[in-house]
């Protein structure tokens, strides 16, 4: 058991890095427990009327801060995968498709963590709480794309798997603003969904249950302080004699260390394992967190924040880069060697079908994702829309090509262009592409993985590179995904498309990168324990998609939220010692 007794010298009891699903849950629950909480978010804050008018509003849609673009959509391309992720106060919730499924059983039974706990039972109450907080309801609206997906399911012989999506949307009366309907009047006013399909461009109406409408809103009401446009570059634990290891200059103070168990006034303790004793630099006396102004070239406005505990929730790419920087830079050297391993893409493929200009039905009068099917036991297919304001996204797609390699797939694309110049012309000069396009999102629970490897550059720079798992590589082609796109194209008279990176470089796209700092039984098998506490350190947690140890096979936001709720349930109220019983998961 650990009890922190340091007085003074801290800016916060807990500092949360990131304001996405894991970060917002952490901010609220820690604030409710009586802690002084700070949140650092690399992106900007958006009011409902500040979202981009379309995806062509580059400055407000795309995230390239050094070029003056501070939007909600980030696209990062590696040699093995292209990753779509979110940015801003509220994280990925600002531009996600608000689809909130509980995963199928294979996720809970994955060998990476199945021996630790009966996760389906352990997480059940936390899924229920996450659903309540995110306002999950079943979408009851049908549209032409739903009918097409239903017919595809019938044609594949899986019509019984067709399901309307559970979504985080306030439907209410379209366009009507009412007092908070979710939190007994403690939340913000809400406006009924108008089925404009703009969920992934940014909801301008106040109907989408983004984190700034629930967890983060309530966290700020409980006193959490959110600092936008701050990028964290370092985490340094205080040593036993003042100043942070490798940093210095921050105020220290006396304190007691310990191993295992959960913390007292400073938060959860470490989980034992590699180097988790009470020695110097284990986090038992707190941390310095250094941040700079996001996107700055010269005037970086470096700030040092001092906290008793830190929750890293910067999203899988941000968290893995930050922790690798700290591990290799020497400030957090005891982080498990498993850091960067078991990175998952949710085994995804993202395709598109654009219907003819004279197609009679409106494909955008819906929420972003309205229904789904399972063509087999481990594959999940959803149809998606950007609404009428996503035309710039057509540059990410080209003609559909089949399986191949980095050499043969570009050749196949050239062959498709030569054989079907009419399709190419329609695609290159498509009018109202977004209005006429069905995005096909395919996800799987299959066990495949890659790694994120740190690469060092000049002047202390660092970036991440991917490396496929040699035994179970991430798929670059999913046959049933192409089959679904081809069926939809034939059924509508449209043009089937695949992502540009997949066709040109054999690099698939995912909107749900996961892992890299996964839950494991010990430091030899994971980076964090069942409570998402970093092995080897006190009061240091990872609460985002980085901790997820397996492909979820569905949209993962609800699972990230539930796991963060689970982790926060183990943190005792401020000033109280931990409960040993609360520290043990349900045995598998």
Model-derived regions, located:
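FAD cofactor-binding and catalytic pocket of flavoenzymes
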Residues: 71, 77, 92, 96, ...
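Patatin-like phospholipase A catalytic core
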Residues: 143-193, 367-368, 377-447, 456, ...
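A glycine-rich dinucleotide-binding beta-alpha-beta segment and adjacent secondary-structure elements
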Residues: 70, 196-199, 233, 438-441, ...
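Glycine-rich loop(s) and the adjacent beta-strand/alpha-helix scaffold that form part
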Residues: 32, 43-53, 205, 213, ...
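N-terminal glycine-rich phosphate/pyrophosphate-binding loop and immediately adjacent elements
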Residues: 1-111, 115-121, 291, 314, ...
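Conserved redox-cofactor binding core of oxidoreductases
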Residues: 118-232, 504-509
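Intrinsically disordered, low-complexity terminal tails and inter-domain linkers enriched
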Residues: 240-282
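Short hydrophobic beta-strand that contains or immediately precedes a catalytic carboxylate
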Residues: 39-40, 226-227, 542-543
